[in-house]
């Protein structure tokens, strides 16, 4: 009997809510299912109320996932639900801000709706961080950060060594150096060489002797004669 009474009361409440919604009165959003097609919600106040219900559900799930009596399967399931709820929250925030020209709710920090540890694009809350596979991901993430930090430190140390080394180099190391001392030396040395080679007030340092260049026929005769002399020497003539 009581079951029928509760069912009748539930139907009556739903009927009263529908009547109130039609007349612009109070509507209990907590008793209704959130719309899956967010873009169909065209009123800002309605969208904000749906989002508030979503935030409440996120808070409930965050509290639930800290329950010490949950097994690993239940923890994983709740954590997956939380990730889906956060994705839905992001869609509501975008719709309210960009489509309905409402406030930017992403900048607001609300209790139990932020936090968690983000690993490879997924959030982990409460006891989900104790799961073996999550612990493995945390270790791998830590090792990767240490490698990146070590690589950056090595690169920075190498840059410091290069700067110290460059500071010890003299001007004559660099090609195209234009230091005053080097330019002055080049000027004097160039003048000295020019005066030695192209001097007009003295004889050249050496004279190339004049001689007749032998013709091809002369060379051939010389080779034949040399061959004859070698044969005579071998024969003892």
From Swiss-Prot:
Self-association state and partner proteins as the record states: Associated with the spliceosome.
GO biological process, one term: generation of catalytic spliceosome for second transesterification step
Subcellular location: Cytoplasm; Nucleus
Designated name of the protein: Pre-mRNA-splicing factor ISY1
Higher taxonomy: Eukaryota, Fungi, Dikarya, Ascomycota, Saccharomycotina
Gene: ISY1
SUPFAM superfamilies found in the cross-reference section: ISY1 domain-like
Gene3D superfamilies recorded: Helix hairpin bin
Source organism of the structure: Kluyveromyces lactis (strain ATCC 8585 / CBS 2359 / DSM 70799 / NBRC 1267 / NRRL Y-1140 / WM37)
Known function: Involved in pre-mRNA splicing.
């Amino acid at each position: 009997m009581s079951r029928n009474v509760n069912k009748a009361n539930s139907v009556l409440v739903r009927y009263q809510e529908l009547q109130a919604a039609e007349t612009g009165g109070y509507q209990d959003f907590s008793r209704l299912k959130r719309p899956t097609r967010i873009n169909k919600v065209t009123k800002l106040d309605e969208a904000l109320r749906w989002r508030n219900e979503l935030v409440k559900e996120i808070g409930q799930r965050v509290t639930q996932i800290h329950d010490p009596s949950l097994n690993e399967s239940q923890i994983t399931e709740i954590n997956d639900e939380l990730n889906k709820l956060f994705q839905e929250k992001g869609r509501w925030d975008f719709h309210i801000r960009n489509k309905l020209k409402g406030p930017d709710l992403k900048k607001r920090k609300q209790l139990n709706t932020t936090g968690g540890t983000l690993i490879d694009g997924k959030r982990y809350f409460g006891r989900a961080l104790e799961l073996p596979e999550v612990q493995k991901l945390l270790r791998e993430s830590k090792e990767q950060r240490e490698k990146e930090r070590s690589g950056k430190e090595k690169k920075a140390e190498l840059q410091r060594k290069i700067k110290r080394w460059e500071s010890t180099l003299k001007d004559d190391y660099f090609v195209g150096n234009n230091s005053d001392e080097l330019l002055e030396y080049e000027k004097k040395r160039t003048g000295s060489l020019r005066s030695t080679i192209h001097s007009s007030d003295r004889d050249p340092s050496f004279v190339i002797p004049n001689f007749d260049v032998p013709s091809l026929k002369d060379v051939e005769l010389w080779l034949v004669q040399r061959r004859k002399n070698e044969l005579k020497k071998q024969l003892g003539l």
